[in-house]
A protein has these predicted regions:
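A juxtamembrane structural motif centered on a specific transmembrane helix
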Residues: 1-3, 401-448
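N-terminal membrane topogenic signal
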Residues: 2-19, 53
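N-terminal signal-anchor transmembrane alpha helix
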Residues: 15-28, 92
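Hydrophobic alpha-helical transmembrane segments of multi-pass inner membrane proteins, especially
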Residues: 20, 36-38, 42-300, 346-406, ...
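Membrane-helix interface motif
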Residues: 28-38
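Glycine/serine-rich anion-binding loops at beta->alpha junctions
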Residues: 114-126, 167, 319, 323, ...
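Membrane-helix interface and discontinuous TM-entry motifs in multi-pass inner-membrane proteins
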Residues: 156-163, 303, 312-320, 324-330
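A conserved mid-to-late transmembrane alpha helix and its immediate loop/hinge
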Residues: 308, 312, 321, 325-374
């Protein structure tokens, strides 16, 4: 007699459990970071939608309902609606450029009453679906077919370019995670080498100056020309010359964008990370910073590295075991701007200490490992590529967010998955992960 199928037993409860623990950490951290805001209203009104914690609790409730709905739906619907969701995301990204409101210099939000919706967060999810749908099509071969490869790059590049126009550098960088997906699916290793080389060129140009980069490039080219001097014309020589000319043009482009496109505070953040202020013994540029909680406080002019300095102080002061829940001085007195969003990790570091931050790191590593391992086991090409996409997106968010809180990455504004305050990001991350859980649950019922 055939055994009756139990859908609950097919879900990856390991992934769901990690998600739940991270969500719980996020709730406690947001409560701690917005404690003064809560106390300013009333402790009995802890779920008041006028507070950050109250709003986040509402979004957590929405996410729980959404998790149940996503797990109950037929997994085929995600394949069917992949291109539709991508099209809707593109329309929203265009609409927000025309009708969105300006927040911190970025025109990337729709204002709906006291709430805000950020289409870029959902565009990542939609791009993951669309890329998975395209690359799982019949006879699609990005390794040997250039047209297929450029189509995949276009699917990634269109929303990325629209997000760039919004001024949201952080979300733009997240789209780079799809390059790892292409590489995993057989694209040339150049897709990993080229970004690394361009990053090195950019760092040399910004840290030591465009003239230094051009001199290094010219000396390298002269050395290679000397090496080829006694040989007959070689096509490789022409290729080498083209590469070096390209490096020079790229370096000039980086310098032009840095000087004429980036704002003063963005240049100051990059300079601080590159150590230029320490070397030149100059104070960084200043910017307007308003404390998170005290809305009536006067604007204070602080050094642009204030966020990073205070974040590192908070993490370092936590020590091994932390100061205890609601006992963090940096947290309670709002020394760190944006502490409920971009700098939420320093709240955990101050109040929970080394053990708390280590636990968060371990949870993220386990989540990424389990996602990649789950993706490798998929029978469906769509599910496999989607799993790689989810892992890539979460990795970029995790790496950049924690990197900027400890001062090794410029402050570009990017949330910590499942922990940072924000309804759009929490909904998008939840959709990303839970759809993968559903696809994996149906893995054994997919024909090879």
């Amino acid at each position: 007699m055939e055994r009756k199928r139990n859908p609950l037993s097919e879900f990856d409860w390991g992934l769901v459990s990690i998600y739940a623990v991270l969500l719980l950490f996020g709730c406690f951290s947001i409560y701690a970071a917005s404690y003064r805001e809560i106390m300013a209203t009333s402790f009995l009104e802890v779920f008041n939608l006028d507070t950050s914690f109250g709003k986040q609790m509402m979004w957590v409730g929405v996410c729980i309902v959404m998790v149940v709905v996503c797990l109950l739906l037929d997994s085929k619907i995600y394949t069917t609606l992949a291109y539709v969701s991508y099209g809707v995301a593109i329309v929203l990204l265009i609409a927000v450029l025309l009708f969105g409101k300006d927040v911190n210099g970025n025109k990337s939000w729709f204002g709906v009453g006291s709430f805000g919706i950020q289409p870029a967060e959902f565009a990542k999810f939609a791009t993951a679906l669309a890329l998975s749908k395209f690359m799982s099509g019949m006879n699609i071969d990005i390794r040997n077919n250039t047209r297929h490869l450029f189509t995949a790059l276009a699917i990634i590049g269109i929303p990325a370019c629209l997000v760039v126009l919004q001024g949201d550098l952080g979300s733009t960088l997240v789209f780079c995670s799809f390059i790892f997906v292409l590489f995993r699916e057989g694209a040339s290793p150049l897709f990993l080498i080229i970004p690394f080389v361009t990053m090195v060129i950019s760092i040399i140009t910004l840290k030591y100056g465009v003239v230094t980069m051009l001199v290094v490039d010219a000396l390298s080219l002269l050395g290679l020309l000397y090496f080829f001097r006694k040989k007959k014309f070689n096509p490789n020589l022409l290729f080498v010359i083209i590469i070096h000319v390209g490096i020079a043009i790229y370096s000039l482009g980086v310098n032009t964008v840095y000087m004429n496109v980036f704002k003063d505070y963005q240049r100051a953040r990059i300079d601080y990370v590159l150590g230029k202020y320490k070397k030149e013994k100059k104070k960084p540029a200043v910017q307007e910073v308003v404390p998170i909680v005290d809305k009536n406080a006067k604007k204070e002019r602080k050094f642009d590295d204030w966020n990073v300095r205070q974040s590192m102080i908070a993490i370092g002061s936590g020590g091994l075991l932390g100061k205890g829940f609601l006992n963090g001085t940096q947290t309670r007195f709002s020394f760190v701007p944006e502490q409920t969003t971009d700098f939420i990790f320093c709240t955990i570091g101050e109040e929970e200490g080394f053990w708390g931050t280590t636990l968060i790191l371990v949870l993220y590593i386990l989540l990424l490992y389990r996602l990649i391992n789950t993706a490798d086991k998929q029978r469906s090409t769509f599910s496999r590529i989607y799993g790689y996409s989810v892992a890539g997106i979460l990795f970029i968010h995790f790496m950049i967010n924690i990197g900027m809180t400890i001062g090794i990455v410029p402050v570009i504004g990017i949330p910590l998955p499942f922990i940072s305050y924000g309804g759009s990001s929490l909904l998008a991350f939840t959709l990303l992960l839970i759809i993968m859980v559903k696809l994996d649950a149906d893995r054994l019922h997919v024909l090879r």
